[in-house]
Amino acid sequence: MMTESEFIRASEALFEHIEDQIDENGWDFDCRFAGNVLTIEAGDGTQIIVNRHTPNQELWIAAKSGGYHFAEQNGKWLATRDSRDFYDVLNEALSAASGEAVEIAEL
């Protein structure tokens, strides 16, 4: 398990990476980071929320498709419920919101 400061640094790097990938690829999303929450909003107002939950050292995604909790395991963020990869879930949510294929590369 990471220390709290390692977790915060890792999650901030991940949030920054997501924003950079969206900007570099020109996808139609607005990103806002405030506190522990990265809000990604599609052109039609659909939101995908990526949240850092420091006490459990988890990342959470909330989207129309549902809510997911991810814990770091061997360098990957995997869903606590079904071991789905963070990027797979995020890319599906972003693609559904935008109506086009979105693929955030792994950090």
Curated annotation (Swiss-Prot):
GO terms of molecular function: ferric iron binding
Keyword Iron appears in the UniProt entry: yes
SMART domains xrefs: Frataxin_Cyay
Pfam family, one: Frataxin_Cyay
BP-aspect Gene Ontology terms: iron-sulfur cluster assembly
InterPro entries: CyaY, Frataxin/CyaY, Frataxin/CyaY_sf, Frataxin_CS
SUPFAM superfamilies referenced in this protein's UniProt entry, alphabetically: Frataxin/Nqo15-like
One cellular-component annotation, GO: cytoplasm
Entry superkingdom: Bacteria
Keywords, in A-Z order: Iron, Metal-binding
Gene3D superfamilies the record matches: Frataxin/CyaY
Role: Involved in iron-sulfur (Fe-S) cluster assembly. May act as a regulator of Fe-S biogenesis.
HAMAP family per the UniProt record, alphabetical: CyaY
Family: Belongs to the frataxin family.
Full protein name: Iron-sulfur cluster assembly protein CyaY
